[in-house]
């Protein structure tokens, strides 16, 4: 099955408004492809909990999530 990539809408504007800080904890309740989570994690030494009810979305993220050294917790549940 081929999955089309989703481009987050207004990514920079949303993350700028959030203004992530070091040691902050954030929730991405519509994780999907993880675009917002990656952007948040790249801006600060923080933790993100990514929720998605689709197990495929969570499974696809497991490999790249390791690059964040445990700062991304993937949760396969609806928010």
Regions found by a protein language model. Give the residues of each.
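Conserved hydrophobic residues forming the short capping helix/wall of the S-adenosyl-L-methionine
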Residues: 65
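Conserved class I S-adenosyl-L-methionine
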Residues: 22-32
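Conserved SAM-binding loop
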Residues: 61-62
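Conserved SAM-binding loop of SAM-dependent methyltransferases across substrates and taxa
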Residues: 33-45
């Amino acid at each position: 099955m081929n999955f089309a990539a989703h481009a987050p809408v207004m990514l920079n504007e949303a993350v700028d408004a959030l203004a992530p800080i070091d040691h902050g904890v954030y929730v991405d309740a519509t994780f999907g492809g993880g675009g917002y989570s990656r952007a948040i994690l790249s801006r600060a030494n923080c933790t993100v909990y990514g929720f998605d009810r689709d197990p495929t979305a969570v499974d696809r993220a497991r490999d790249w999530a390791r690059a964040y050294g445990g700062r991304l917790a993937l949760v396969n549940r609806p928010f």
